[in-house]
Amino acid sequence: MAFSFGNAGGGGGGVTQGKDLEVIQTEGLGFLALAGDAKVQLTSKWSPPPAPTASLLSIASRKGLVAAAGPDAVHVATTESVRKAFLAEKNGDSEVRPFNPEAKLPLPLRISQLAFTADEQYLVLSAETGGGLRAYDVNSLTQGNTQSAFELATNGETLRQLAPNPMPESAAFCAIVTTNGNLYMANLAERTLVSGPNGPTLRSQVSCAAWSTKGKQLVAGMADGSIYQMTPDGTEKAHIPKPPNLGDYHVSSVVWLENNVFLTIHNPTNSTNPDDKTVYHVITRQQSSGSPPNFTFQKLNDPVEPFVADKTPHHTVLRLKDFPPNLQDLLLVSSTAVETIGLLTRSKTPLATDKPADAITNVFTTTELADDSRRAQLPMSEDMMETYPIGVALDLSSKEKVYKPIPTDEEIEYSPGPLPGLWVLNNEGVLASWWVVYNESIRAGTTYSGIGGSSEVIPASPAPALASSTAPVPAFASPVSKPTFGSPSPATPAFGGPSALGTKASPWATAGGAASSTPTFGQPSFGKPAAPAFGQASFPGLGQKVSPWATGSTTSAAPAFGQSGFASAGTAPGKVFGSSFTAPSSGGFASFATKSGFASLSAPSGGSSIFSSKPGAPLTSAAPEVSMDTDTAFPPPSTKTDKPAFGSSPFVLGSTFKADPTAAHDIEKPKEGESKSLFDTGFGLSLEDAAKQPASAAESKDEEMRSTTPPLPPPTETKPKSIFESTTPTTTPAPQKFEFKTTTPSGFSTLLGSTKPVASSMPNIFATPKPTSAEKPKSIFDTLKPKEESKENLLKASEPPLPPDTTSKAVFQPGSSSSESAESSPGAAAKAAFKVGNDETPKPQKELAPKPEAVPLPPDFVKAKPKTEAKETKAEEPAVSPNLPVKPLAKKAEPIPAVPESASEEEQGQAEEEEAESGEEEEEEEEEGEGEEEEEEEEEEEEEEEEGEEGEEQSEAGSEGSGVDVAKDLSPTAKFGSMTPGYTPHTSLGGMAESTFSTISRSEVAEQSRPLFGEITKNAPPLFPAAGPLPVSPRSPSPVRGVVRSSILRPTETPRPVDTTPVPSRKGLLQKTASFGMSTGQKPAVDPNVKAQRKLAEKLKAEEQVLVDPEDEGIQQILQSKVEPTLRMNEFLAVDTKLAPMKPGRDDVPNACETLWRDINRMIDRLGLNSRSLQSFILGHTSHGKPGGRQKDDLEKPDDWVLIEAYDLGDMIDNKLARELEAGRIKDVEGTMAAIHNLGRDLAKLRAKEEDLRKLFNAQVDPDQIALTKALPLSAEQLAQQNELRRSYASFSKLLTEAEEALTVLKAKLASANAARGRRGAGAAQVPTVDAIIRTINKMTSMAEKRSGDIDVLESQMRKLRIGSLGPAGTPNGNGVGAGTVVPATPGGGGRSRESSPFVTPQSSRRAMFMSPGSVGTATPRGLLAATGTPSPTKKKLSMYTAEEKRELRAREAKRKATLRMLRESLARVGPNVVRLRDDD
């Protein structure tokens, strides 16, 4: 669309070219660097640099936050921490200080626009490629959540400008100008784009936009140079024409200053002419009612004009309005073509004195800073290249006063209050910061309004609730949201989707049928246009790039296989603008393919945002994806337990599960259909509900490492990883990241390709009405519902290993650990248990009985498969109580020895000892073992139920419990095949009577006899009736142990908090159902290992050994040795025993007793060592005191002090030091401060003088400086002194001459007087009188003049002959004539004065005395040249003569000397001749 306004005013109004505005230089404004030359590396360097229109820095002043976008991440930090970074120590020669932000949001693509809304509720981002908007809730960001609140699409168009509304009450509106020239208006409250008369595009051909000061209307700068005024819904209110006499220019930037005052910046459009420069105008509109408006255009000089116009600049204008006392407007202008910051000002009082006051007051002026040191200029890059701003923002969050705001004013120490800050981010990622200093404000004691958080903070209004059919949107747009009311039907997205239950339909397109347009193999849906679904409006247009924020192809609601992000496959299909049901896209900001715009939060989605994993996602685990292979019966991605993010190594010592911040909710049952907020659930959600949020980050790590089963095929590992580390667990049966309510099992799309829907008949292992723990976080150990775990989950998340125990863990098959009995390896039983997971409650396990055979776990020792019994048992079990803790799946443990014979020699030795003790009773033990086991298992079930109740609380507390340790303690004894350790209080694991248990492979046993994770819920009836009260655990008491289980007796693990997970339930189930067939009465065949073990027992009888802890002897020696005093406490020793496990083939009871004995001994040893450490520490601090007590000097060596000297220290501090400090305290504080102030002022003056002296010394010492100084012309003062000196010298010469004359006269008179006296004497010679002498002189003078005339005539004649060769004749100075001499006339016309002739006789010494320095004819340079330029014979060099000439000259000289000698001799002979003159002569 083109507009041709020419110079016509809007509505026929007039257009006037006003007078150009002034340019002034002022000292009343300036910038003060925050910390000298210091800069901060806020983000990494951009390469290639961002677009010139990028705006990558924004500050929320009231909350004190700053956000800056780098090429790889968005950095969010507090402004205070950034300011402190400026004051950090300098690193080397670089002035750039490093900085680590409080929050960092890694991004897969680059950002082009970033801004906080005016109410500081949202941080809005836009991608450099594909555009779109992504909004983050600022409050959630500050709490560590990194999920976006929502996203909006911009039709695949990249943003040129993002202009949030400036008023907090209207902060929901955000103007968007795209690079295609389209103007959109985003309504963040409704999370959609405002639809105007022409749809979402309010106007095309727009180049920029700006809001009014009250945020009620906005103006749009057009590509043709004109401006439109409109309302946020696109209704046009006014039109401002293009400035007159302006060529092909577009509006680059516009600022709405007042209702009728605008500032515009026009740039040439596609111009190659370097003379086409940026043009600034202040437009004033006058309009009387009923008449068209008149516009006055006044030009302003460019405050940031580039030196070389080699590129079209992009300008950013920041405004400080009403800066008291007199500054009405201060506009800070930055340009991408210049590294400096320019100023435009409007002041009530003149800021400069060299212009008329009325010309520069109350009008805008281009303001230059007179003091270069107070200018703001970006630093050079490391390679000394110029940089340019990519982000400019005002910091009004400071609360500190500024030291020396006006450096030249020594009287002002601090500013009256905080100052506005200007922050500029350049393309190197370096942040420069200055304080904006208004001198008049500093001196008047005023502060800029709104600074330091003084402005009223308008609370951010929450986004309107979405339609009831959609899940509540979490603060960070957790895609895990489920239908708010548990509606199994997919909910439509709040924006862009078909209306559902009042959901507002997207203005961008009509709802279309769900299509199956999923990303192609390896094609990320992020940032790519989605294929319109059937019936989908193709708003983006054919071939147009769709915003990466909300891109997604339309597809069924079923999640793509391995898909992550916010586009849940099983959720209500969402749509990007123009698509009714978008396919779940993985990756990209718009992996929220199923969401309207940029992730409709209203619909539960399952894709992972490329921006971050859901809070429930593992820290570094990939976003949730379909967690099962293609053959799985459970398509929902969330059904798979997330694979550990940190490999499969076992956990380190410590609780596997950390405290759940939302533990209070963990105990609650998930509510059907309740939406799960990514952060509402807290950390540590129910393991069983993959759709539920994972546990805390710590839990995720721990749980990840407990998986013991091998990972599944790659398809499940292709899930994209979250850019932001989630703080939630990874392997707690990872809560379904984004619920996949599989409404239609369509093909699953994934970044790596699409796979056909798996088990479409079972859209979700979690029945569509899934309980959501989002609002009611579930304990990590919460009951696991079959729906939550697909068989893939079980396989993927193998048995969570106990904290690292090389011996016990190695003995157990995956899932066989005593402490992990509740979570035996997800083997066939586990898979079978939940092959059908569509319902809320677990289905009978019998149905899945055959499945385990398909995937046997590692070494299957015995093929006897009482699995059927186990499965039947599971089938009999009711649904696991949602409140019962569930053992989370975790990282797979280290490989486990498969055969009991592989036990170490030490184990065998111990086993032999046990056999020796129980030798002949083995067979009886086997028979009795069944009975005992049955009773004990029943007791364990009861105990299990109690533990289940307590487990929730303890799981919330993050304690694994000694149950885990003991499980490992017992696990060594369970090395009988896959035997799972029993609870010592109830049964002795490892009894040969139970050896039949070992005949069943561990995986099978686990699979057969346990629920998904092997736990018995407290709601589930015991498989076997309780057999009486629980036996007391033989384990020693522990303050951290609640319910003690038999599994706690493992000797090889340090005691831990009670593991309240219902581990024993699985063991009991396994042992009863699998080994003894207590439920079904089936017994497996006799374990072949039993015979071998019996033979081994016979051998052990002969080689009976005493059961001894291998470390016991050394520890006893240490305990019996003398206690050595020490001043440092040794580290507390926990029971980290690494004793070799007991050998298999022993009776349960003896084996358990031995384990218990070793464990107790180990604990006692550790207690002794800890006690010894305390004794050494106490002894050291009681015996190493300084004799005679401590003195003040001892304070210099704090390490030498001991605890018993604390009293000396207290006395010293309270008495001696206190008195000395009091004595040294400054009494006259004010006087001292005044003296210091005076000294400071004097010091400043001295420093200034020192600097002057240093410059003076340099000028006198440096030869170059001296030469330069001499070459400089004389100053006016020096010239005056020179002239005065010349006048004085002339006067002195005149006086001297007069004195000489008077002296001569005096001598003459004396001579006359002597002569008179001499006549009286006889024969006295007469002396001539004065008169006679005067007459003689006059006569001689006349004779000389006569001769002079003759000489002049002769000179003239000679000149005619030779002078032409000596110099140009006829010129005033060509023949040596001095300045002012008379040029000779034509031949015969008279001679010239011989005074100026080069042949003139030198003046007598007397006459020279009458000459002043300025009276010489050659005083001028030309005269000097004339006087000295004419050559004379005497000045001819000897080398210039020939040999002949030399002989001639020598001969002449000889004659002359001879003549002179003859003259002297003659005069000597004649003697003096006295001539007497008469008076008449």
From Swiss-Prot:
<feature type="repeat" description="PXFG 2">
    <location>
        <begin position="493"/>
        <end position="496"/>
    </location>
</feature>
<feature type="coiled-coil region">
    <location>
        <begin position="903"/>
        <end position="957"/>
    </location>
</feature>
<feature type="compositionally biased region" description="Basic and acidic residues">
    <location>
        <begin position="663"/>
        <end position="677"/>
    </location>
</feature>
<dbReference type="GO" id="GO:0006606">
    <property type="term" value="P:protein import into nucleus"/>
</dbReference>
<feature type="repeat" description="WD 2">
    <location>
        <begin position="201"/>
        <end position="241"/>
    </location>
</feature>
<dbReference type="InterPro" id="IPR039462">
    <property type="entry name" value="Nup159/Nup146_N"/>
</dbReference>
<feature type="compositionally biased region" description="Low complexity">
    <location>
        <begin position="607"/>
        <end position="616"/>
    </location>
</feature>
<feature type="repeat" description="PXFG 3">
    <location>
        <begin position="519"/>
        <end position="522"/>
    </location>
</feature>
<dbReference type="InterPro" id="IPR015943">
    <property type="entry name" value="WD40/YVTN_repeat-like_dom_sf"/>
</dbReference>
<comment type="subunit">
    <text>Component of the nuclear pore complex (NPC). NPC constitutes the exclusive means of nucleocytoplasmic transport. NPCs allow the passive diffusion of ions and small molecules and the active, nuclear transport receptor-mediated bidirectional transport of macromolecules such as proteins, RNAs, ribonucleoparticles (RNPs), and ribosomal subunits across the nuclear envelope. Due to its 8-fold rotational symmetry, all subunits are present with 8 copies or multiples thereof.</text>
</comment>
<protein>
    <recommendedName>
        <fullName>Nucleoporin NUP159</fullName>
    </recommendedName>
</protein>
<dbReference type="Pfam" id="PF16755">
    <property type="entry name" value="Beta-prop_NUP159_NUP214"/>
</dbReference>
<feature type="region of interest" description="Disordered">
    <location>
        <begin position="607"/>
        <end position="647"/>
    </location>
</feature>
<feature type="repeat" description="PXFG 5">
    <location>
        <begin position="532"/>
        <end position="535"/>
    </location>
</feature>
<feature type="repeat" description="PXFG 1">
    <location>
        <begin position="483"/>
        <end position="486"/>
    </location>
</feature>
<feature type="compositionally biased region" description="Basic and acidic residues">
    <location>
        <begin position="773"/>
        <end position="794"/>
    </location>
</feature>
<feature type="repeat" description="WD 1">
    <location>
        <begin position="106"/>
        <end position="146"/>
    </location>
</feature>
<feature type="region of interest" description="Disordered">
    <location>
        <begin position="1385"/>
        <end position="1404"/>
    </location>
</feature>
<dbReference type="GO" id="GO:0031965">
    <property type="term" value="C:nuclear membrane"/>
</dbReference>
<feature type="repeat" description="PXFG 7">
    <location>
        <begin position="644"/>
        <end position="647"/>
    </location>
</feature>
<keyword id="KW-0509">mRNA transport</keyword>
<dbReference type="GO" id="GO:0006405">
    <property type="term" value="P:RNA export from nucleus"/>
</dbReference>
<feature type="region of interest" description="Disordered">
    <location>
        <begin position="662"/>
        <end position="991"/>
    </location>
</feature>
<dbReference type="GO" id="GO:0017056">
    <property type="term" value="F:structural constituent of nuclear pore"/>
</dbReference>
<keyword id="KW-0811">Translocation</keyword>
<feature type="repeat" description="PXFG 4">
    <location>
        <begin position="524"/>
        <end position="527"/>
    </location>
</feature>
<feature type="compositionally biased region" description="Polar residues">
    <location>
        <begin position="741"/>
        <end position="763"/>
    </location>
</feature>
<feature type="compositionally biased region" description="Basic and acidic residues">
    <location>
        <begin position="837"/>
        <end position="850"/>
    </location>
</feature>
<feature type="region of interest" description="Disordered">
    <location>
        <begin position="1414"/>
        <end position="1443"/>
    </location>
</feature>
<keyword id="KW-0853">WD repeat</keyword>
<dbReference type="GO" id="GO:0008139">
    <property type="term" value="F:nuclear localization sequence binding"/>
</dbReference>
<keyword id="KW-0539">Nucleus</keyword>
<feature type="repeat" description="PXFG 6">
    <location>
        <begin position="559"/>
        <end position="562"/>
    </location>
</feature>
<feature type="compositionally biased region" description="Polar residues">
    <location>
        <begin position="724"/>
        <end position="734"/>
    </location>
</feature>
<feature type="compositionally biased region" description="Basic and acidic residues">
    <location>
        <begin position="862"/>
        <end position="877"/>
    </location>
</feature>
<dbReference type="GO" id="GO:0051028">
    <property type="term" value="P:mRNA transport"/>
</dbReference>
<dbReference type="GO" id="GO:0005643">
    <property type="term" value="C:nuclear pore"/>
</dbReference>
<keyword id="KW-0175">Coiled coil</keyword>
<keyword id="KW-0813">Transport</keyword>
<feature type="coiled-coil region">
    <location>
        <begin position="1233"/>
        <end position="1318"/>
    </location>
</feature>
<feature type="short sequence motif" description="Bipartite nuclear localization signal">
    <location>
        <begin position="1435"/>
        <end position="1442"/>
    </location>
</feature>
<dbReference type="InterPro" id="IPR026054">
    <property type="entry name" value="Nucleoporin"/>
</dbReference>
